[in-house]
Amino acid sequence: MSSPHGGLDDQIERLMQCKPLPEPEVRALCEKAKEILMEESNVQPVKSPVTICGDIHGQFHDLAELFRIGGKCPDTNYLFMGDYVDRGYYSVETVTLLVALKVRYPQRITILRGNHESRQITQVYGFYDECLRKYGNANVWKTFTDLFDYFPLTALVESEIFCLHGGLSPSIETLDNIRNFDRVQEVPHEGPMCDLLWSDPDDRCGWGISPRGAGYTFGQDISEQFNHTNNLRLIARAHQLVMEGFNWAHEQKVVTIFSAPNYCYRCGNMASILEVDDCREHTFIQFEPAPRRGEPDVTRRTPDYFL
């Protein structure tokens, strides 16, 4: 007897071979994903054990390596903190695979929104152009960017590890503040939703102006107050290239996790993932780039901001 998930399992198998799905299949998949994501909270609760991952940026073969090292989904539960697309050569295959896994195993994988899951940013940094190249039109780009509006903004592991792409906001004191806003929209240029996806921890105290032009920098005093107010042990975030794949800040109140090794195929960094076990103990696993088969011939006309 054929399994009710046969078609989806077949799609996942094709995607694991780095083969894009036809446009009608992408559309149907994103419709199913939207129904699942609509039900998720702005602060999505997640149970341990779970493996927390940072930016992927279209580096498909390195995502396959991440699953090889961390365990296949659904054998391992995963929480991804955004930035699936742009910069790497395989944004289409990367984001389609993660969305397909979400539809197939909704309780086993959580996919948060990053600052690159936006219409505006993807038109500059590669995903839009890649969709045009692979499909001959912008329909798949539109389908995915419409879906991105439904991705949860943050997650909370066992009520004590707060996970999000960027960082904190001067407009947000409590997790309830986040639970109460309407996330189904393009990432705004400013305000609390923007800050969650764009802010960075900093060595200086207090709030600072971000060199990125969006979000803020926040000091250890801010992290400590936020963690204290919300009974948190740790803030886990992504958004910044760190050479070892992970980096502690604010006396271990904040950790940055970056999961794209040799970022942009030239930065020479390690990648890492963070395993949180049943006892809420955590272990970082570092990994290097997967062996590369020749890269596609793509002209790079994107500006280099390395943040």
From Swiss-Prot:
Residues given in the record as Mn(2+) 2 binding sites: D83, N115, H165, H239
Keyword Manganese found: yes
Active site: H116
Enzyme class: hydrolase
UniProt entry keywords in alphabetical sequence: Cytoplasm, Hydrolase, Manganese, Metal-binding, Protein phosphatase
Free-text remark on how the cofactor is bound: Binds 2 manganese ions per subunit.
Reaction equation(s) it catalyzes: O-phospho-L-seryl-[protein] + H2O = L-seryl-[protein] + phosphate; O-phospho-L-threonyl-[protein] + H2O = L-threonyl-[protein] + phosphate
Residues binding Mn(2+) 1, per UniProt: D55, H57, D83
Coarse class of the protein's main subcellular location: cytoplasm
Protein name, UniProt field: Serine/threonine-protein phosphatase PP2A-2 catalytic subunit
Taxonomic source organism: Oryza sativa subsp. japonica
Lineage: Eukaryota, Viridiplantae, Streptophyta, Embryophyta, Tracheophyta
